[in-house]
Amino acid sequence: IQTNSNLLLQLISDVLDVSRLESGKLQFNYEWCELVTHCQNMITLTNRNKTTNADVRLQMPKEPYMLYTDSLRLQQIIINLLNNALKFTPAGGSITLDYTVDKEKQCMLFSVTDTGTGIPEDKQELVFQRFEKLNEFVQGTGLGLAICKLTIQRMGGDIWIDKNYKNGARFVFSHPIKKRESEEK
């Protein structure tokens, strides 16, 4: 009963998030966020709550990077991607969070890569649709990736699956970068 109650609560919360995102009523609170520390905290949180023996790690530049973002929404996106990767990565597998700066496109590219079961190429676009679940035996509402996509798009970015990665799945999303006033001079 407890598990079903939690799933129902999550479903209601997810449906409300989708509705607010689509109507433009979801508020974004932008601030300068130091990415290395923020991402390390997400990895720590994910490792603390994981129920499998997969290795979850951070692979990124160690120098601080300030990103103008809604840090809670960014955390929601990344935690969702990490948790999804955990659902499909067997014990002994690995999950990596990474980011790079694409100066040419003026965006940050985040990726969550796993060594799990992967996603068939003909199903890759489906995973971003509402209530779409490729595996009915895995818990979830089928709204997490739809929420990620809507949130990322509202933040000015996009999300996709790296079709060239064949050792599991790699989700990549872009986030616009904004220069700080001190950097513009």
What are these regions (language model features)?
Residues 49-58:
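Short conserved segments within the C-terminal catalytic ATPase subdomain
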Residues 144, 148:
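Short alpha-helical Gxxx[C/S/T] motif in the catalytic ATP-binding
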Residues 19-30:
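Helix-loop junction within the histidine kinase core
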Residues 119-131:
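Short conserved segment of the HATPase_c
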Residues 29-44, 75:
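A conserved beta-strand-to-alpha-helix junction within the catalytic ATP-binding
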Residues 3-8:
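Short alpha-helical segment of the dimerization/phosphotransfer core of two-component systems
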